[in-house]
Amino acid sequence: ITTYLDKPGWLACLTGDFLTQFYYYRYAGPTILTLSILMAGYNVRCGVEDADIKGTWIPYTIAIAVMTMLVCFSLHYDYRLSSIIAIAGGANVFRFSTKILVSTRMFVKKLENQALRHTSIDGTRLPQWITAVSIFISMLVCHWFFGCGMWIYAALVLLGCIKYINKPGNYTRLAAITIPLFIIILDKRLYFIDFHTLYTYPGLGKFVKPQMDLEKTLAADCEYYFGNYNKVVNMIEKDKEPNSYMKFYYNLISAQGRSLPAVLLKYPDNNLGTFETLGPDTPPLTIKTLNELYWILGDMTFCERAAMLANVCSPENRNIRMMKRLAEINLVKGDY
């Protein structure tokens, strides 16, 4: 667990990875993803309202826009649940810090009244400095806990500054947002990551089209892993143009049933069967599929190599499936 501290946004990553493991169960993945997006939208709406923009359509519009954006980002297979948690966390830090700030300013006002200082609290510079210090600390804490979620926090603070643009102290608040961004640069030597990753971890996401071809590949891969071979065969035979990964699993199942020669030329560019080319540019997905081939062949040396490469080639990979395969290999080899 301590390895999560090697990157910013450790709480978002830890929470996201913990919830991601439940994707293993049917219908759990869509449920967790939907609830996470709704939670992010709810926190953003409440954050906008805490910025004193209430009773209008703006908070709901911004929340819907953020949730729509997260849905579009989630179409990319590499967009992690941790990124959604980071956005929700950034908005939550703003809500929490705002409530503490209001309570602190009320406490200061009581102290002034007790001291018989009749000057209004809004007429002194003390509240401005309290607000600036609160924003400064919250930005750094938000980056440590939620990484890129600090941009949501900064956006909500900026929204509040726009709301009260004519009030004194706006420049102080803007400085309190900007200064931590430069201080975070010093964390580069702490985390040993580039500047882009430092400010965007665990990931901002990008707009992509639905990757239906990859979805079919992962569906075939998962069904094969769970031993639903007939379902994999039916899935591939119904597809008019199965991709190379789908044909690989089709050939692998046929080979186990001793019927590979009969189906080898059923699809174009399928004459190599279960043979694949390995090299420096081999995709991680190919390495994972070859892991299943080596396991069926009983070659534990290459199977172990493929399982380890599948983890090494993917940064921050905590793939329980490959860890389980390494444990299975140790049981077969007697290394326990």
Regions inferred by a protein language model and the residue ranges of each:
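Membrane-interface coil-to-helix junctions
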Residues: 1-19, 23-35
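Transmembrane-helix motifs of polytopic, lipid-linked glycan transferases
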Residues: 34-52, 89-99
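Transmembrane-helix signature of polytopic, membrane-embedded enzymes
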Residues: 48-68, 123
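Membrane-interfacial, low-structure loops and terminal tails that flank and connect transmembrane helices
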Residues: 52-53, 101-126
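Aromatic- and kink-enriched transmembrane "portal" helix at the membrane-lumen/periplasm boundary
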Residues: 66-84, 143
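Membrane-interface alpha helices of multi-pass inner-membrane proteins
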Residues: 109-110, 123, 131-144
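Hydrophobic helices that insert into or interface with lipid environments
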Residues: 139-215
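Soluble catalytic regions of membrane-associated enzymes that act on cell-envelope
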Residues: 198-336
